[in-house]
Regions:
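Catalytic loop of short-chain dehydrogenase/reductase
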Residues: 61-65, 95-170, 182-184
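Hydrophobic positions on the long internal alpha-helix
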Residues: 42, 56, 82-90, 160-161
Length: 228
């Protein structure tokens, strides 16, 4: 059984239709991850259907999607909402997976960032991160500020995941994060369309290059480095 959650009900229903064809029982629950009450309702709903054994938290936005404020609200504060809401209902032996990004490793974690991260449970947590993102060197570039906010928010995902490892272990559960690199998704396509130079710079960081294209042929389709 799978519970799909997100803001776009049409996309969820399309995914549900595919799961139905595969014989997988699934449900949709429209949820704004940045809204703690909605996330709590999602956790309660999932628990009402049976044991919650796996929580895969993939929600996130990038500078190509939205502005600085929403990046912090969804990526950072949204992660807190998910962890805090699902920790109580996660069944023994369960696992929670949070999606970070390789972007988290492109910026050093300063003392100021650490202090802000440690205030995750304070009322002004969101505002603290917003202030740090506003201290970008190129203050005339909203895209630059949003890029900094993205890296910072994804670094927070790693921080908050690690912070909760022992807590989850106490109930014989696991929590971990993964950090995908650049691959072609609708979100990344927006970056290619709107910021081609930035997208090209990211592509150059993929060491596989042509080998990635060959790899796609091996698995049955022809693509490129961003396709895998």
């Amino acid at each position: 059984m799978i519970v799909l959650a997100g803001r776009n009900l049409a996309k969820m229903e399309a995914a549900k239709a595919e799961l139905d064809e595969l014989g997988v029982e699934s449900y949709c629950c429209k949820t704004d991850i940045a809204d703690r009450a909605q996330v709590q309702a999602l956790a309660d709903y999932a628990a009402s259907l049976g044991d919650v054994t796996q929580v895969i938290h993939t929600s996130g936005v990038s500078p190509s999607d939205t502005a600085t404020e929403n990046i912090i609200r969804i990526n950072a504060a949204g992660t807190v909402n998910m962890v805090e809401a699902f920790y109580p209902v996660l069944a023994e032996g369960g696992v929670m997976i949070n999606f970070s990004s390789v972007a988290a490793y492109t910026m050093p974690q300063t003392d100021e960032w650490t202090q802000a991260f440690e205030a995750w449970n304070e009322p002004d947590f969101y505002e603290r991160l917003l202030v740090l993102a506003g201290e970008a060197e190129d203050e005339e570039s909203e895209f630059f500020r949003a890029g900094l906010a993205y890296a910072m928010s994804k670094k927070f995902v790693i921080y908050f995941t690690q912070k909760n490892v022992a807590r989850f272990a106490e109930k014989h559960c696991r929590i971990l994060s993964i950090s995908p690199g650049c691959y072609l998704t609708p979100m990344h396509q927006k970056l290619i369309d709107n910021q081609p130079e930035t997208a090209e710079n990211q592509l150059e960081l993929i060491p596989a290059g042509l080998a990635a294209i060959v790899a796609t042929v091996v698995v049955g389709f022809v693509g490129g480095p961003l396709a895998i």
